[in-house]
């Protein structure tokens, strides 16, 4: 899964933007290698 500060989804390639637990994810059932997550604030210890 790619993690970057700014993610873009391409619906023509099967990408879907999903918000889970306050983070943005790109999921793709056709091509699972296109998974992405938007980097948020660092985790609290």
Curated annotation (Swiss-Prot):
The keyword Ribonucleoprotein applies. Residues 1-45 are annotated as: Disordered. Pfam families: Ribosomal_L36. Signal peptide: none annotated. GO terms for molecular function: structural constituent of ribosome. GO terms for cellular component: ribonucleoprotein complex; ribosome. SUPFAM superfamilies: Ribosomal protein L36. GO terms for biological process: translation. The keyword Ribosomal protein applies. PROSITE patterns: RIBOSOMAL_L36 (PS00828). It comes from the Bacteria. Keywords: Ribonucleoprotein, Ribosomal protein. InterPro entries: Ribosomal_bL36, Ribosomal_bL36_sp. NCBIfam families: rpmJ_bact. Belongs to the bacterial ribosomal protein bL36 family. This is Large ribosomal subunit protein bL36.
